[in-house]
């Protein structure tokens, strides 16, 4: 029979599909017919296929068995036809439909009683004809599903003999191997899933990044350059730092990657400055050793939070020196620099000039007694260190003295007309966040003044002027140039990103305290060179995320920091979800353990987790893990339910895309959860349960088919927010990562095999609130 082959589908051995495959395997073994047999995960039932014309096949197991019997000896087949054909008819028309839906003990008792009657009224042989083949596989199916076969003496006695015969033993082994890819030893085998078992519309997939290939702007595509504020190297980021810049930018970058936009996300540690010098002195190491240590710590934190930079660099590089000095020299030659003598605070104890942030005292504006010399955390106002009441050196608490020193100033007053014209246009075109606009307008309205951009330090980018040898560039002139140099360390073709305003849009994410440096000082520096640069298109800022009753404080042990969040034992997705749903987009927000637990249990678990798990388990139980044959036209079947469902999802999806395009990340997450909730409602509206499956087959298939496709969409739209959760959903669906579409498409097609259902989330016990609050200083002591 070289022109034929048998294909056996993947299935659980407790399924009736497995029993049907076993029929054919017994026939191959018992009738000594040489026909090739192969596993075929892309089919739903056992098939006899014409090898030369594979589109032609028979998928009825009894018909295949009868054909193989006829091929063995035509005379025997004719004799069989006349005497036992009615038993096969009964088996196909009566037994099989009930076997497919059997679930309860009563269901199997009915099947066994019918089989016992067959044995009473007919001569059943101890050898194989098509009838014995069918009965053997039927009884095997009942045994594997826990049916009380021993209570039926005739069929149980016969089965005990037949299951030991060589054809049955060989057939069982063959079916296991072809069905599962390996011999099975328990009743809980998992159906193998792979790309060969997929039936997915491949026109809507997310474009994969090629490992090792540098991302460069492309013509005729959206080229999106994203940065997040460079974290200062010797600070361990707390949750507020993370959501304020790196996590927010990561969501935006992942969204645009999932839209198949050409996207580059750059960040790195800001490593120069007084703070590094002083911290290194405290720890007894060199500044470079300190930076190496903390750069690795930052990278570890961001990796755990699944923040996916295209490149995470640092500012202490030769390229930083070269680019920063180039910009400085251009500004100097263009007469946008001025030299002046200024008075600085000097600590006579450790013999060094003090950067503003290393002078502490009482704020003259609000009376906050822990203000820094550059800014007050109490009122948010910018300060001059000399304005502080009772100033102290942060390092040794000595009272600093005043000393004169010569420095270079950036003439922001000369640059104001250019930067003001640019800012007003960019704020409108780029739809800046409210904080970005208001803070910038406030600075410009007050009038820009020359700002000192050099410091008396050793650790920094050297000032490229001979008379200033021994001085370095001030970190807030130097640090923002780090975005450019970090890109230059990523690719030698960095100018295609940073000198290409016609093709590239620059999006920058940060906390509100960093706004002036990105909307005034950095743009002024670029404009003053007279060269073509990619300028800020959109700035996105956050207010402050506070902790319980106050502020995060590493020194006081208050709050969760990046290197301690993982100790709690929850997945990064749980943290990302809460932080982004509480993102301080328009005002300060508060992290509380009570809300953290409540949102996890009532939103992640009860909404998204429930919908995904319920649908996938139903598909596995009722459809053997295959996407059922649903009607793809939403106007056909199920009245208005399906059409309204599609309409609602598309309306929410449009709002989701609009929110993400505007970098309204919290609103986008809320809409994603609303789409998931609409999926739960759709299942409830269709009353998906065993009764629906048994008596409204097409309605049930439609509902499950659409629900599975909605889960595929949810995996895509949650990818920016909870990438590992989306990866788990893709794995459970056995589907490749999907692009985020403009409108919802049905991409999981009938016959596609899903993977093994798993829980996305598990409940957090409410009692953990007090334990975590106590451990992380949330009792109001701060």
UniProtKB/Swiss-Prot annotation:
Q: Which PROSITE patterns match?
A: AA_TRNA_LIGASE_I (PS00178)
Task: Offer one Pfam family short name for this entry.
Answer: tRNA-synt_1g
Among InterPro entries, the record links this protein to: aa-tRNA-synth_I_CS, Anticodon_Met, Met-tRNA_ligase_1, Met-tRNA_synth, Methionyl/Leucyl_tRNA_Synth, MetRS_core, MetRS_Zn, Rossmann-like_a/b/a_fold
Q: Does the keyword ATP-binding apply?
A: yes
Cite the PANTHER family for this sequence: METHIONINE--TRNA LIGASE (PTHR45765), METHIONINE--TRNA LIGASE, CYTOPLASMIC (PTHR45765:SF1)
In the record, the note on similarity to other proteins reads: Belongs to the class-I aminoacyl-tRNA synthetase family.
Protein name, UniProt field? Probable methionine--tRNA ligase, cytoplasmic
């Amino acid at each position: 029979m070289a022109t034929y082959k048998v294909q056996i589908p993947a299935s659980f051995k407790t399924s009736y599909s497995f029993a049907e495959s076993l029929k054919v395997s017994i026939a191959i073994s018992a009738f000594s017919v040489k026909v090739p047999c192969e596993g075929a995960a892309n089919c739903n039932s056992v098939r006899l296929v014409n090898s030369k014309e594979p589109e032609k096949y028979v998928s009825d197991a009894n018909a295949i068995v009868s054909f193989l019997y006829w091929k063995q000896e035509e005379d025997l087949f004719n004799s069989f036809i006349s005497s036992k054909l009615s038993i096969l008819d009964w088996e196909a028309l009566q037994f099989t439909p009930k076997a497919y839906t059997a679930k309860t003990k009563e269901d199997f008792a009915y099947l066994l009683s019918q089989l016992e009657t067959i044995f009473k009224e007919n001569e059943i042989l101890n050898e194989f004809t098509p009838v014995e083949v069918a009965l053997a596989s039927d009884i095997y199916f009942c045994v594997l599903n826990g049916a009380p076969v021993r209570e039926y003496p005739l069929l149980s006695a016969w089965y005990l003999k037949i299951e030991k015969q060589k054809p049955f033993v060989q057939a069982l082994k063959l079916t296991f191997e072809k069905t599962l890819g390996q011999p099975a030893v328990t009743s809980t085998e998992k159906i193998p899933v792979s790309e060969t078992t997929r039936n997915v519309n491949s026109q809507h997939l997310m474009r994969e990044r090629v490992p090792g290939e540098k991302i460069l702007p492309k013509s005729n595509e959206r080229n999106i350059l994203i940065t997040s504020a460079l974290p200062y190297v010797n600070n361990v980021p707390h949750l507020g730092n993370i959501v304020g810049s790196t996590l927010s930018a990561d969501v935006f970058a992942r969204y645009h990657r999932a839209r198949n936009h050409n996207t580059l996300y750059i960040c790195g540690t800001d490593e120069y400055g007084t703070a590094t010098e002083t911290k290194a002195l405290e720890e007894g190491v060199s500044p470079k050793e300190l930076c190496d240590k903390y750069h690795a710590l930052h990278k570890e934190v961001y990796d755990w939070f699944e923040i996916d930079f295209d490149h995470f660099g640092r500012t202490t590089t030769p390229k930083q020196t070269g680019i920063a000095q180039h910009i400085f020299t251009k500004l100097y030659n263009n007469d946008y620099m001025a030299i002046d003598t200024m008075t600085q605070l000097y600590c006579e104890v450790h013999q060094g000039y003090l950067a503003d942030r290393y002078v502490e005292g009482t704020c003259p504006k609000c009376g906050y007694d822990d203000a820094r010399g550059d800014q007050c955390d109490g009122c948010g106002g910018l300060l001059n260190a000399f304005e502080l009441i009772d100033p102290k050196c942060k390092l040794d608490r000595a009272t600093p003295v005043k000393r004169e020193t010569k420095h270079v100033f950036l003439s922001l007053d000369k640059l104001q007309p250019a930067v003001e014209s640019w800012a007003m246009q960019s704020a409108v075109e780029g739809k800046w966040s409210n904080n970005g606009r208001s803070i910038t307008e406030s600075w410009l309205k007050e009038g820009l003044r020359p700002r000192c951009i050099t410091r008396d330090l050793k650790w920094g980018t050297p000032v490229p002027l001979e008379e200033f040898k021994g001085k370095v560039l001030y970190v807030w002139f130097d640090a923002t140039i780090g975005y450019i140099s970090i890109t230059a360390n990523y690719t030698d073709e960095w100018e295609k990103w940073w000198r290409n305003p016609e093709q590239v849009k620059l999006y920058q994410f940060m906390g509100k305290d960093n706004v002036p440096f990105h909307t005034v000082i950095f743009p002024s520096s670029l404009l003053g060179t007279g060269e073509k640069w990619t300028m800020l298109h959109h700035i996105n800022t956050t207010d402050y995320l506070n902790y319980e009753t106050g502020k995060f404080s590493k020194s006081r042990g208050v709050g969760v920091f990046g290197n301690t969040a993982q100790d709690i034992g929850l997945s990064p997705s749980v943290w990302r979800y809460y932080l982004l749903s509480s993102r301080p987009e328009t005002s300060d927000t508060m992290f509380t353990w009570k809300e953290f637990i409540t949102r996890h249990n009532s939103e992640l678990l009860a909404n998204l987790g429930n919908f995904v798990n319920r649908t996938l388990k139903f598909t596995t139980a009722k459809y053997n893990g295959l996407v059922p044959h649903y009607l793809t036209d939403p106007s056909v079947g199920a009245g208005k339910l399906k059409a309204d469902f599609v309409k609602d999802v598309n309306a929410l999806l449009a709002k989701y895309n609009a929110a993400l395009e505007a970098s309204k990340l919290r609103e986008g997450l809320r809409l994603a959860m609303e789409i998931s909730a609409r999926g739960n409602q759709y299942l409830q509206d269709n009353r998906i349960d065993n009764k629906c499956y048994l008596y409204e087959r097409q309605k049930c298939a439609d509902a499950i088919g659409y629900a599975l496709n909605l889960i595929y969409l949810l995996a895509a739209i949650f990818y920016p927010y909870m990438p590992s959760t989306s990866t788990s959903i893709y794995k459970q669906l056995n589907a490749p990562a999907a692009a985020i579409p403009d409108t919802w498409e049905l991409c999981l097609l009938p016959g596609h095999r899903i993977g093994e259902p798993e829980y996305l989330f598990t409940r957090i016990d409410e009692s953990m609130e007090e334990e975590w609050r106590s451990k992380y200083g949330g009792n109001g002591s701060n």
